[in-house]
């Protein structure tokens, strides 16, 4: 007897360095639990982020900036991702790194503006009137051609639609008759017609005719329930950048130039301020009419000290514009020279006039106990068994070196344990691996000792 194991077809996600972060881990009153949702410690920073999430949800935070400042390996990126998780998928979250703005094709400010627009969502509500049912009759009515001659033109189309509740006869425009012909609609088909645009969609043949033929390449659909005339509310989520791109490069065009343009490699073009202004006007009109609502999202700029003085000056204006998202900066620098200047030093590599506009959240170094908890969570995420002794030793290594280094030792130590035929990582495996791989501090120490042997 042969038994086959059926493998799951669901996508296996690669474990990234922040896969374990599921949220900020706050209770109902907004206080941080010691360890929850994959985050450990940093209670003050997490509570501050919780307040920001509440402000974003109540739409009172637009155009403000927050700076996550702290030493490397204290969880700044993890906090930003936790904010994104808390906000959910409906609020746009656009992550970028400070060095992304340097491009040979377009200006630095253009890259910043593009990401600003990516972080602002627009929720468009549309009520569509739809006629839906099975076609019972389809009669085009002809009249004499007004241009003279013997030809005849179609003046209107009479169509009968039937649902489970009743039937309706509609008198339609001749332009819809062309759509009906394109869709090859005939009696017995289930169709729907949009009242606003006159678009016709054939859904399939009604399943009462399913027994008519043995061989047929038709898709049979049930008779629609409810009335023939229905109202459907459709909600679409788009970002302002999507609207910019759609209008910057219009599709179509039958002439040879536009055909060539589509075939050639599209060069990244800049979207002009004029076009953005026009789109803003249309968006504002929609908001005034109540068709759409603006959803200010989050723009996360990691390694913000990589931006130069021109970008920072541009950020002043962008943050104070009428349509601006919430901007979260992250930096692990202390006092350093602002990029693009000769000798101006500033905290976190950000000019003082911009620092004045941001709210700063500090992240502190982890205690050995918190390091152990984080390593334990990482081991669970990666599906690794680890003994208590090995965990304590990794915690000590993390305190002496960095958290990242001790987390990186997990996978090689697990491999070594498997080679030795053990199920879980023991202390000796961790010791052996830490001797094989150097951390940054010990590597720098060796460099200092043997400086004369290396090339200058």
UniProtKB/Swiss-Prot annotation:
Enzyme nomenclature, EC number: 3.6.4.12
Localisation: Nucleus matrix; Nucleus, Nucleoplasm; Cytoplasm; Membrane
Gene: RUVBL1
Biological process, per Gene Ontology: box C/D snoRNP assembly; cell division; chromatin remodeling; DNA recombination; DNA repair; positive regulation of canonical Wnt signaling pathway; positive regulation of DNA repair; positive regulation of DNA-templated transcription
The protein, known as: RuvB-like 1
Keywords: Acetylation, Activator, ATP-binding, Cell cycle, Cell division, Chromatin regulator, Cytoplasm, Cytoskeleton, DNA damage, DNA recombination, DNA repair, Growth regulation, Helicase, Hydrolase, Isopeptide bond, Membrane, Mitosis, Nucleotide-binding, Nucleus, Transcription, Transcription regulation, Ubl conjugation
Crosslinked residue numbers (Glycyl lysine isopeptide (Lys-Gly) (interchain with G-Cter in SUMO2)): 2, 225, 445
Organ and tissue specificity: Ubiquitously expressed with high expression in heart, skeletal muscle and testis.
Transmembrane portions of the chain: none
Catalytic activity of the protein: ATP + H2O = ADP + phosphate + H(+)
GO cellular component terms, A-Z: centrosome; ciliary basal body; cytosol; dynein axonemal particle; extracellular exosome; Ino80 complex; membrane; MLL1 complex
UniProt binding sites for ATP: 70-77
Effect ascribed to mutating residue 303 to Q: Reduces ATPase activity. Decreases interaction with NOPCHAP1. No effect on formation of RUVBL1-RUVBL2 heteromeric complex
């Amino acid at each position: 007897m042969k038994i086959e194991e059926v493998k799951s077809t669901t996508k296996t996600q690669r474990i990234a360095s922040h896969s374990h972060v599921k949220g900020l881990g706050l209770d109902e009153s907004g206080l941080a639990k010691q360890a929850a949702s994959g985050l450990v410690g940093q209670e003050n920073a997490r509570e501050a982020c919780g307040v920001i999430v509440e402000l974003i949800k109540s739409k009172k935070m637009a155009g403000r900036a927050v700076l996550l400042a702290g030493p490397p390996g204290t969880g700044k990126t993890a906090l930003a991702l936790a904010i994104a998780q808390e906000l959910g998928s409906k609020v746009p979250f656009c992550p970028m790194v400070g060095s992304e703005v340097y491009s040979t094709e377009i200006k630095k400010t253009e890259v910043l503006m593009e990401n600003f627009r990516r972080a602002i969502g627009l929720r468009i509500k549309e009520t569509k009137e739809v006629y839906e049912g099975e076609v019972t009759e389809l009669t085009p009515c002809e009249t004499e051609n007004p241009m003279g001659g013997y030809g005849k033109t179609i003046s209107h189309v009479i169509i009968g639609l039937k649902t489970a509740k009743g039937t309706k006869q509609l008198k339609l425009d001749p332009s819809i008759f062309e759509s009906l012909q394109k869709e090859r609609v005939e009696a017995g088909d289930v169709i729907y017609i949009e009242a606003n645009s006159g678009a016709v969609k054939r859904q399939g043949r009604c399943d009462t005719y399913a027994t008519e033929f043995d061989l047929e390449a038709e898709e049979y659909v049930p008779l629609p329930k409810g009335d023939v005339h229905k109202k459907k509310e459709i909600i679409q989520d788009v970002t302002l950048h999507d609207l910019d791109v759609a209008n910057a490069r219009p599709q179509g065009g039958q002439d040879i130039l536009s055909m060539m343009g589509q075939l050639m490699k599209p060069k990244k073009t800049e979207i002009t301020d004029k076009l953005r202004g026009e789109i803003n006007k249309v968006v504002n009109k929609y908001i005034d009419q109540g068709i759409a609502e603006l959803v200010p999202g989050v723009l996360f700029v990691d390694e913000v000290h990589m931006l130069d003085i021109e970008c920072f000056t541009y950020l002043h204006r962008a943050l104070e514009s009428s349509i601006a998202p919430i901007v979260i900066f992250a930096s692990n620098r202390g006092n350093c020279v602002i990029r693009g200047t000769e000798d101006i030093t500033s905290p976190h590599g950000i000019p003082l006039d911009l620092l004045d506009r941001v709210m700063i959240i500090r992240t502190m170094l982890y205690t050995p106990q918190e390091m152990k908890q984080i390593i334990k969570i990482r081991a669970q995420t990666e599906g690794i068994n680890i003994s208590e002794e090995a965990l304590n030793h990794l915690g000590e290594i993390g305190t002496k070196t960095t958290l990242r280094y001790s987390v990186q030792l997990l996978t090689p130590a697990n491999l070594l344990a498997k080679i030795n035929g053990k199920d879980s990582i023991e202390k000796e495996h961790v010791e052996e691996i830490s001797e094989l791989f150097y951390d940054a501090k010990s590597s720098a120490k060796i460099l200092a000792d043997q400086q004369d042997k290396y090339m200058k």
